[in-house]
Amino acid sequence: MLLWLYHSLIMSDQNTASFYIRNIPIFGRFILAPMDGYTDSPMRKVCKNFGSSLSISEFLNGIDVTRGHPHFKTQSYFDESERPFIYQIYDDQPARFLAAALKLAEHQPDIIDINLGCSAKNVSNRGAGAGLLRNPAKIAEIAGSLVQNLPIPVTAKIRLGWDEQTENYLDIAHLLEDCGISLITVHARTRKQAFTGQARWSAITEVKQAVRIPVIGNGDVVSYADGIRMLDETGCDGVMIGRAAIGNPWIFSGSDRKDIDNGELLAVITSQLNLMVDLYGPGIAVPVFRKHLVRYLQGLLNTSEIRRNIFSIANPHNLLQEISELIDQRQPQ
């Protein structure tokens, strides 16, 4: 009953904003989380078609943005259909962080997001991402500088703290709000937990009750029903879905992937692969798409022979033919 009621409320009036990021209306409460190596423009477009209300770049290294990087063009690419669009940046140096944000602002995104949540050791151990949670003064310097110098809203994504002994999420939330940040996303785990253990949704509730700006919840949402439950239990303004959306854009619309018919499954796979070919060229698109394909074809790549055959195909057209034949064997449940 609760799932049906929330879905009806969410879908009833597409002309009414669910919440605002400063002056930007957001239509919908389910959002694709930024994931390094996954949430490129093709994946964002596919998920937006199914209901993701915001498009967020893969996290961008401030060093790469300011100095240049061979993959920067494709990593930073977005088009008008993805709006509202956010660039997410990580860095440990305030001056370079601002320089990167100003450079990215030239591409006319709608919002810039400060990554204070990445738990990867190569990021957090250098003091960037979740590593910044150990240095509130530097967070204030970065957030204040971006808010003062950018003409667009600035948001931030945080974790609960570096570890269970140094949780400071409420202090960081207040600090960010005081700096003029327009929205906070809370991944309800510590940096030490990374993606292990259970996300503590009660912390999302605490942040929502502590600040006046919108709060997005993140962590352990693996189904549409989980997202509805997070909204209900925490009072957050929106729900961010990450790993559960890989190969499953239907999670944003409330449909169960196992109920999707074969024709629609093939059409969505084809759409994402074609978008990737347009962005990267076939030589890069096909191998990069394989990690998505494994999730789309969950339960169908049952033998090493099937996997070897699928993963040996380099031509996009031939790959889609093989995928079509494989999907024909699938029985929607």
Residue ranges, per PLM feature:
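Active-site beta->alpha loop and helix N-cap motifs at the rims of alpha/beta catalytic domains
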Residues: R83-I152, R159-T166
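Non-cysteine beta-strand/loop elements that form the S-adenosyl-L-methionine
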Residues: S57, I111-S119, C179-A188, M240-A245
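Conserved, mostly hydrophobic/aromatic
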Residues: L32, C47, E58, Y87, ...
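Alpha/beta catalytic cores of nucleotide-metabolism and tRNA/nucleoside-modifying enzymes
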Residues: L9-R22, I26, D36, S41-P42, ...
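Glycine-rich, positively charged N-terminal anion/phosphate-binding segment
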Residues: S12-Y20, M35-D110
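Active-site-adjacent beta->alpha loops and helix N-cap segments on the catalytic face
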Residues: V65-F72, K121-S145, K192-T205
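Active-site beta-loop-alpha junctions enriched in small/polar residues
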Residues: M35-G37, L60-G62, Y90-D92, G117-S119, ...
